[in-house]
Amino acid sequence: MKRILTLLTVVLSAVTLNAQYYYLPSTTNGNPGGLNADSEYPVGGGLSTTWTSISSPGASTPQWSSINAIPFSFDFNGSAVTHYKVSTSGVLTFDTAAVTPPSYTKGTLPNSGIPDKSVCIWGLAGPGANDIIVKKTFGSAPNRQHWIFFASYDAYGSSCWTYWSIVLEETSNKIYVVDQRNSCTSASFSIGIQVNSSTAYTVAGSPNVSPLATTDATPADNHYYEFIPGSQPANNLVGNAITVADFLILGNAPFSMTAEYLNGGSNAVTSATANYSINGGTPVSAAVSGLNIASGTSATITHPTAWTPSSVGTYDVTFWTSNPNGSTDDVPNNDTVVKQVVVVNSVAVRAPLIEVFTSSTCGPCAPANTTFTALMGQQTAGDYNFIKYQMSWPGSGDPYYTTEAG
């Protein structure tokens, strides 16, 4: 029995020593996995009522949220965790016994002011009447995501609003930090995972990571950081997207076959084999050299063999890589990207027509016309057309009104 307990102690110690994280930045816009399609608005101001509030607004000093259960099995740094709480300063911790919430003033990670077992978007602040932390679970077992969303939050020391989330993913035990919506121009944050006071995994640029999302309330402009448990593989090309145009003119063939790839490995990628097939046909493979894709960055890979379609029509294009740096790809299931392209004989360029209705009896119309004219003057000539109609209202209407406009 003593020998079994000793062996168990050794195994658990090995798990603890080997547990770690690495992170990859997203290179395409949107939410991780596409499960959360909700719009990003304040609580009570457009946010779906399916979210549950876990904090109170108006936190002039940092406060903790309520303690919440994770709705599925989840490991942090190799050990099971079941509950969490969140500070209004942007820190989620699995150490629910932590007493003092982190300061609104961000710092470098690791930091003695951050509890062990924490995920940080440090530099957020919740003093406003709309600054509320909410939670929601998306998807179905065993691939659910639990979102903790800082809705309509402040960036400490800035007069602006910003929206961020921390996401826990079932089965993979991945943690995502999602940059969702932002009006800040000078705010920055300390983003990362703190295991303890001596160990942290941070996003490059911390504690001064700037938001990348715009004011768009949809996920279309979202950006995220993916924290992955375990050791980073040495060679791992991750397919982002095929970058061939959606529509191709047959007479312009042959076409370069290109795709964007993220280097998810620890080694810089200097060579690889590029492959593509059309409509599931015979693969076209060729070696690509002269690459220089640093770890955590993206680049476009161009296949040495161009494609000449046989005729107009719709084609399914599959592009994948293999043999990065002359070695086996350590994670081959993320190498492939697909796209449908349409080959046509010609393309007609269409210019939008803008119709404007105005009148000399309309007070706001004069400044609006001035603004509109200035805006149109910034556009490229020939890219648009507009027509202005003089109207019979309000009041007696414009003296230049004609019945054709009515």
Regions found by a protein language model. Give the residues of each.
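Bacterial Sec-dependent N-terminal signal peptides
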Residues: 1-22, 230-233, 258
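Extracytoplasmic Ser/Thr/Pro-rich, glycosylation-prone low-complexity segments
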Residues: 19-236
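Residue-level signal for well-ordered, solvent-exposed loop/turn and beta-edge residues enriched
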Residues: 20, 79, 174, 267, ...
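Short, solvent-exposed loop/turn and secondary-structure capping segments
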Residues: 95-98, 159-160, 365-369, 375, ...
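Active-site-proximal beta-strand/loop segments in catalytic clefts of secreted hydrolases
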Residues: 149-153, 179-181, 355-360, 389-393
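Extracellular/luminal regions of secreted and cell-surface proteins that mediate adhesion/ECM remodeling
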Residues: 231-350
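Local sequence-structure signature of Cys/Sec-based thiol-disulfide redox active-site neighborhoods
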Residues: 346-389
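Thiol-based oxidoreductase modules, predominantly thioredoxin-like and allied folds used
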Residues: 380-405
